[in-house]
Design a protein with these regions (language model features):
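Conserved SAM-binding loop
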Residues: 13, 85, 103, 138, ...
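Short beta->alpha linker loops
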Residues: 19, 43, 47, 71, ...
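Phosphate- and divalent-cation-binding pockets in alpha/beta enzyme and binding domains
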Residues: 23, 51, 113-116, 170, ...
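Substrate-recognition/cap helix-loop segment adjacent to the acidic, metal-dependent catalytic center
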Residues: 25, 29-31, 51-58, 82, ...
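Acidic, Mg2+-coordinating phosphoryl-transfer loop and its flanking beta/alpha structural elements
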Residues: 159-200
Length: 220
């Protein structure tokens, strides 16, 4: 039984993965680089410091990485108002707080986006802290975000909740299990194959099944 939970933001609590994919697609196109959008979607969950090389190569990262990240941020800013909380997101966070769990958002978003999404969710008072890109040197699948979130939670043990391969891999490198949801566009089988401890078809299903996870009350 864990006393802390780390929550991914994009694709897990906020329906934003496809907006991020479109933003990156457009950013690449403005630099004359065509990357199929389905391939970009598979990389969402990585931060921009990892995504450029993964989508293209080290030469493009070296020559254009910073300008591509800047362009992607501008494109996403234009799409951000189209993002919305995923069904059951606020209720899940509220339930985690009700269980007296330490709740930390494990994100490498910039501070502005994170504050915007916290306001959308309406759960700022229900979380104990969060990470942003300023807290990490390398984004997922490196464990920096997870380790920074653990530090804010004041523990070395927690459960990760996420939607992607990159969440699972980052958590595993910090020896944490992941409860995964398919809300980010990865299939149940894929998430299981990458090592998720359990997979849920919605945040509501996850909330209703919490007593079957390490987040159950200690009395159970």
């Amino acid at each position: 039984m864990s006393g802390a939970v780390l929550l991914d933001l994009d694709g897990t609590l906020i329906d934003s993965n496809y907006q991020h994919a479109l933003a990156w697609y457009r950013a690449f196109r403005t630099h004359g680089i065509v990357v199929p959008i389905w391939q970009i979607h598979r990389l969402i969950g990585m931060g921009g410091d990892q995504l450029v090389t993964a989508a293209t190569d080290e030469e493009i990262e070296r020559r254009r990485g910073d300008s591509l990240r800047e362009a992607a941020a501008e494109e996403f800013a234009a799409l951000r108002d189209e993002c919305s909380p995923l069904e059951g997101a606020s209720e899940l966070v509220t339930e985690l707080e009700r269980r007296d769990l330490t709740v930390v958002l494990a994100s490498s978003s910039n501070e502005d986006d994170l504050e915007f999404f916290l306001d959308l969710l309406g759960v700022k008072d229900a979380v104990d802290g969060w990470t942003t890109q300023a807290d990490v040197e390398k984004s997922k699948p490196h464990p920096d975000v997870i380790l920074a979130a653990l530090q804010k939670a004041g523990t070395s043990e927690a459960v990760m909740i996420g939607d992607s391969r990159w969440d699972i891999e980052a958590a595993a490198k910090a020896n944490l299990p992941t409860l995964a949801v398919i809300t980010g566009g990865w299939s149940e089988q894929e998430l299981r194959d990458f090592g998720a401890a359990a997979v849920y078809d919605s945040l509501t299903s996850l909330r209703e099944g919490l007593d079957e996870t390490p987040l159950r009350p200690r009395s159970l």
